[in-house]
Protein backbone atom coordinates (compact mmCIF):
# COMPACT_ATOMS: atom_id res chain seq x y z
CA UNK A 1 0.00 0.00 0.00
CA UNK A 2 1.13 3.47 -0.75
CA UNK A 3 0.99 5.93 2.08
CA UNK A 4 0.00 9.45 1.32
CA UNK A 5 2.59 11.99 2.19
CA UNK A 6 1.37 14.43 4.79
CA UNK A 7 1.23 17.96 3.58
CA UNK A 8 2.54 20.33 6.18
CA UNK A 9 1.55 23.93 6.09
CA UNK A 10 2.68 26.68 8.35
CA UNK A 11 -0.67 27.53 9.87
CA UNK A 12 0.38 28.67 13.33
CA UNK A 13 -1.02 32.09 12.52
CA UNK A 14 -4.38 30.56 11.63
CA UNK A 15 -4.36 28.44 14.80
CA UNK A 16 -3.66 31.42 17.04
CA UNK A 17 -6.49 33.39 15.43
CA UNK A 18 -8.80 30.38 15.85
CA UNK A 19 -7.76 30.02 19.50
CA UNK A 20 -8.47 33.67 20.23
CA UNK A 21 -11.85 33.42 18.49
CA UNK A 22 -12.70 30.21 20.37
CA UNK A 23 -11.80 31.78 23.71
CA UNK A 24 -13.84 34.86 22.88
CA UNK A 25 -16.84 32.71 21.97
CA UNK A 26 -16.44 30.68 25.17
CA UNK A 27 -16.34 33.79 27.36
CA UNK A 28 -19.38 35.28 25.63
CA UNK A 29 -21.33 32.02 25.99
CA UNK A 30 -20.34 31.79 29.66
CA UNK A 31 -21.58 35.32 30.33
CA UNK A 32 -24.86 34.52 28.58
CA UNK A 33 -25.38 31.39 30.68
CA UNK A 34 -24.53 33.19 33.94
CA UNK A 35 -27.10 35.85 33.08
CA UNK A 36 -29.77 33.10 32.95
CA UNK A 37 -29.00 31.83 36.46
CA UNK A 38 -31.59 32.59 39.12
CA UNK A 39 -29.51 33.40 42.18
CA UNK A 40 -31.05 32.74 45.62
CA UNK A 41 -31.92 35.56 47.96
CA UNK A 42 -29.83 36.10 51.08
CA UNK A 43 -32.60 34.70 53.30
CA UNK A 44 -32.98 31.59 51.14
CA UNK A 45 -29.22 31.06 51.07
CA UNK A 46 -28.95 31.29 54.86
CA UNK A 47 -31.94 29.04 55.56
CA UNK A 48 -30.80 26.33 53.14
CA UNK A 49 -27.23 26.49 54.46
CA UNK A 50 -28.51 26.03 58.01
CA UNK A 51 -30.64 23.08 56.86
CA UNK A 52 -27.62 21.43 55.23
CA UNK A 53 -25.44 21.96 58.31
CA UNK A 54 -28.13 20.51 60.60
CA UNK A 55 -28.56 17.46 58.36
CA UNK A 56 -24.79 16.88 58.34
CA UNK A 57 -24.73 17.05 62.15
CA UNK A 58 -27.72 14.69 62.41
CA UNK A 59 -26.32 12.10 60.00
CA UNK A 60 -22.85 12.19 61.55
CA UNK A 61 -24.37 11.73 65.02
CA UNK A 62 -26.39 8.72 63.84
CA UNK A 63 -23.30 7.19 62.20
CA UNK A 64 -21.31 7.76 65.42
CA UNK A 65 -23.90 6.00 67.58
CA UNK A 66 -24.30 3.09 65.14
CA UNK A 67 -20.52 2.71 65.13
CA UNK A 68 -20.43 2.72 68.94
CA UNK A 69 -23.18 0.09 69.11
CA UNK A 70 -21.44 -2.21 66.63
CA UNK A 71 -18.15 -1.69 68.46
CA UNK A 72 -19.79 -2.70 71.73
CA UNK A 73 -21.43 -5.74 70.10
CA UNK A 74 -18.15 -6.98 68.65
CA UNK A 75 -16.43 -6.77 72.06
CA UNK A 76 -19.09 -8.84 73.87
CA UNK A 77 -17.83 -12.34 72.92
CA UNK A 78 -14.39 -11.49 74.30
CA UNK A 79 -15.71 -10.28 77.66
CA UNK A 80 -17.22 -13.64 78.65
CA UNK A 81 -14.86 -15.89 76.84
From Swiss-Prot:
Major site of localization recorded for this protein: membrane
GO molecular function: protein transmembrane transporter activity
Segments traversing the membrane: 50-70
GO CC, alphabetical: plasma membrane; plasma membrane-derived thylakoid membrane
Pfam family, one: SecE
Superkingdom of the source species: Bacteria
Alphabetized PROSITE patterns for the sequence: SECE_SEC61G (PS01067)
UniProt keyword annotation of Transmembrane helix present: yes
Topological relation to the membrane, as annotated: Single-pass membrane protein
Record-linked InterPro entries: SecE_bac, SecE_sf, Translocase_SecE/Sec61-g
Subcellular compartments: Cell inner membrane; Cellular thylakoid membrane
Gene3D superfamilies named in the record: Preprotein translocase secy subunit
Keyword annotations of the record: Cell inner membrane, Cell membrane, Membrane, Protein transport, Thylakoid, Translocation, Transmembrane, Transmembrane helix, Transport
GO biological process, one term: protein targeting
Family classification: Belongs to the SecE/SEC61-gamma family.
Assembly information from the UniProt record: Component of the Sec protein translocase complex. Heterotrimer consisting of SecY, SecE and SecG subunits. The heterotrimers can form oligomers, although 1 heterotrimer is thought to be able to translocate proteins. Interacts with the ribosome. Interacts with SecDF, and other proteins may be involved. Interacts with SecA.
Summary of the function given for this chain in its UniProt record: Essential subunit of the Sec protein translocation channel SecYEG. Clamps together the 2 halves of SecY. May contact the channel plug during translocation.
Name of the molecule in the record: Protein translocase subunit SecE
Lineage: Bacteria, Bacillati, Cyanobacteriota, Cyanophyceae, Synechococcales
